Amino acid sequence: MRKYFGTDGIRGRANGVITPELALKVGQAAGLLFQRGEYRHRVVIGKDTRLSGYMIETALVAGFTSVGMDVLLLGPMPTPAVAMLTRSMRADLGVMISASHNPYEDNGIKLFGPDGFKLSDEVEHEIERLIDSDLQKRLSASADLGRAKRIESVHARYIEFAKRTLPRNITLDGLRVVVDCANGAAYRVAPETLWELGAEVIAIGTEPDGFNINRDVGSTAPDALVRKVRELRADIGIALDGDADRVLVVDEKGQRVDGDQLMAVVARSWKEDERLTQPGIVATIMSNLGLERYLGGLGLSLVRTAVGDRYVLEHMREHGYNLGGEQSGHIIMSDYATTGDGLVAALQLLTVVQRQKRPVSEVCHCFDPLPQVLKNVRYGAGEPLRKDSVVTAIEGARQRLGNAGRLVIRPSGTEPVIRVMAEGDDRDLVVEVVDEVVEALRKAAA
């Protein structure tokens, strides 16, 4: 059982879970662990636009410099940009201060190794051990303390990186694009990238004030984007989340396109171009069965993992896949990036749109998603999933669905909630089986 790290770094309420004291210790512990050899060591630190980012950034700088690491400060930058710059700047470690799609009150600390990948469970466990040790005995001597420096050219570096993921013969000339940056980390780089590639860009969610990240904007709240696309008769809307590692698209009719549909478009395109390194893609247990059937019709498989982009990426790396993602919009393209990158994923979709010279609505809706119902059951103490009545209800629900659907029962990794999801060809049956399982869980949790 891990004490500090969850499935996506350390995350919680700022000045509640994520305190200056904890951030200081994380900096010291990670700094000690990633010092190898006698040369000067350095860490890059990026953040999103939350008010608490200043506090956490300052505490991390104190932690890293106190154990002799030099710090390169990037300011507000997307998570995938931090991962890319960690590699590009030959840093020993990368840090992103963000709570992704959560409200401004929360914040988090994500760590990347020198290769730009998120740290393994084993390395995170070792950092936890060091956090709880006597770090005062391992501080650097006065003459060996680290320095901190703010880097000014990082936006241009990431913009050039993102542009290079587009084939050289493809431009975005003639496209009217609305991009929603969620008042988050991509508020500068995303509109600039799209404009430099030739698009007419209308940007919303680009006025961060420390409090408005993800508030009624971004990939988890796309209504504002839908309205703007319809109002301006745009060709496409692109919604990023607070740290820009996920994306949701809106077509010219205002219809939403989720991560499953985006993966379907890219998978088909890459199969035709013989770019897939394996005959399939990697997704999670939450991806729609319609995606699996669509890929099967193309001769491609869908491998499922636990929920979380880190598990998708782990399977991709272990088994040689170069495309994977989540329904929520984390799209991982390992030819380009070591983590989900919302802007790069959107550019790959736009590549297909420009090549085919068809509207986004015709390119994107590759399959009809099966009816899917998701409900959450909150519980107190105990383990309701172990109760006989719940086990019986789950078994009965799966038997009723048979081969015409799926049932997924998943405890949340961040709160005392059990998620019940079912999908199938018959919507009425899907609703019934979810309600039966939810009722059994509520009685068991009472």
UniProtKB/Swiss-Prot annotation:
This is Phosphoglucosamine mutase. GO terms for cellular component: cytosol. The keyword Metal-binding applies. It is an enzyme of class 5 (isomerase). NCBIfam families: glmM, PRK10887.1. It catalyses: alpha-D-glucosamine 1-phosphate = D-glucosamine 6-phosphate. Catalyzes the conversion of glucosamine-6-phosphate to glucosamine-1-phosphate. The modification Phosphoserine is found at residue 100. The keyword Ribonucleoprotein does not apply. One of its GO terms (molecular function) is phosphomannomutase activity. Binds 1 Mg(2+) ion per subunit. SUPFAM superfamilies: Phosphoglucomutase, C-terminal domain, Phosphoglucomutase, first 3 domains. Activated by phosphorylation. Disulfide bonds: none annotated. One of its GO terms (biological process) is UDP-N-acetylglucosamine biosynthetic process. Belongs to the phosphohexose mutase family. The active site is at 100 (phosphoserine intermediate).
